[in-house]
């Protein structure tokens, strides 16, 4: 495949003379900018002193346009004036690198950027980052710093603070986030701490993607010799401590459930794995089940550790206006999500057959005989009500 970028010039020179290594380059892009620089390493046998420069002049993101799809945009100007110093054991970098007049629209990023700039100032063995990204609905501010005075103990910190950052994950999720996050990196540890507020979200699930169907918890992978394959460990441990607040304008439309969600969660990750604690409430909702439009009277999803094992405590009732004798009839779902217990209930309390009759028909069993009772009993058995299973 031919690279869809035209070059006015590409030059590269390298050599070693009198114990000194030199590398020089020039890349001149047609109708765009230049990337040029040189690096020198003196006293190769001992001190390995570093010197050189890197310059990026008038470079724009037009060079990636050939790789964009229809309707996608990538605009911005990249510039750098950098100077290299120090030695191989303690490299120093001075100068400035920046991306300005940034505008990006594309399916490969979670949000559109209407205006943005990111600048990094290098101060020898430290650097400072600042930036601001504006989106159609909000913004994201970036600050950070890095320190490599000790190469084996370098560290970098980036803080992100934003408001109404509209994140789209087509076709199912549109969500506004107000992040207040701090990301820290060290040679042997990555950390993410902070808070994410979600004031608004629209989550619509038509079909469950194949990727969302997880493997069995007792699945064992085998190699070609039919021996168990040990799970791979991440090269750098990850720690996270996040507070997630779900606001008052978050709705879910999935598998017959239309509901408003609120709640607060704590996400923790360490070498033991990912943990989730907190509660999601369903203050209002409708659920289609058993051919009925049920109203969610109580809805709680509780997390206490494992992400994939929330505890359900949900009650959905038939519309009381369409139920005879002022009876409340509904479905109660309790227990762990992978093995919930489903019960038919009524207020006042009736037999399961009578309660199911009120739930499905809005009236009690015919007093005259056993036919209706037998039919309801058969339906209860068929539905598995009162048993643990994957009914919901």
Where are these regions (language model features)?
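Short acidic, glycine/proline-rich loop/turn micro-motifs
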Residues: 63-68
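Strand-loop-strand
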Residues: 3-31, 77-80, 102-104, 109-371
């Amino acid at each position: 495949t031919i690279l869809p970028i035209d070059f006015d010039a590409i030059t590269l020179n390298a050599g070693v003379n009198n114990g000194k290594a030199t590398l020089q380059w020039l890349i001149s892009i047609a109708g765009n900018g230049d990337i040029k620089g040189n690096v020198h390493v003196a006293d190769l046998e001992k001190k390995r002193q570093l010197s050189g420069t890197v310059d990026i002049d008038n470079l724009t993101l037009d060079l990636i346009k050939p790789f964009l799809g229809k309707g996608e945009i990538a605009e911005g100007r990249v510039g750098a004036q950098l100077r290299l110093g120090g030695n191989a054991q303690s490299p120093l970098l001075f100068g400035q690198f920046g991306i300005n007049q940034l505008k990006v629209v594309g399916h490969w990023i979670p949000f559109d950027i209407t205006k943005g700039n990111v600048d990094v100032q290098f101060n020898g063995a430290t650097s400072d980052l600042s930036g601001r990204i504006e989106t159609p609905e909000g913004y994201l501010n970036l600050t950070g710093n890095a320190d490599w005075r000790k190469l084996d103990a370098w560290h970098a910190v980036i803080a992100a603070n934003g408001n109404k950052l509209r994140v789209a994950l087509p076709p199912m999720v549109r969500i506004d986030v107000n992040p207040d996050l701090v990301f820290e990196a060290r040679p042997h540890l990555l950390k993410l701490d902070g808070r994410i507020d979600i004031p608004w979200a629209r989550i619509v699930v038509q079909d469950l993607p194949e990727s969302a169907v997880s493997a069995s918890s007792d699945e064992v992978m085998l190699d070609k010799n039919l021996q168990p394959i040990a799970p791979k460990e991440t090269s750098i441990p990850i720690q996270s401590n996040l507070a997630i607040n779900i606001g008052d304008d978050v709705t879910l439309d999935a598998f017959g459930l239309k509901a408003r969600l609120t709640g607060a969660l704590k996400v923790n990750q360490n070498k033991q794995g990912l943990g989730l604690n907190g509660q999601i409430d369903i203050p209002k909702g409708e659920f289609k089940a058993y051919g009925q439009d049920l109203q969610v009277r109580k809805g709680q999803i509780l997390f206490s550790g494992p992400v994939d094992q929330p505890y359900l405590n949900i009650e959905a009732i038939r519309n009381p206006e369409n139920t005879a004798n002022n009876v409340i009839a509904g479905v109660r779902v309790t227990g762990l999500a992978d093995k919930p217990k489903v019960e038919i209930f009524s207020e006042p309390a009736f037999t399961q057959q009578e309660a199911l009759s009120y739930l499905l028909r809005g009236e009690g069993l015919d007093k005259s005989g056993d036919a209706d009772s037998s039919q309801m009993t058969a339906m209860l058995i068929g539905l598995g009500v009162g048993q643990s299973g994957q009914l919901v």
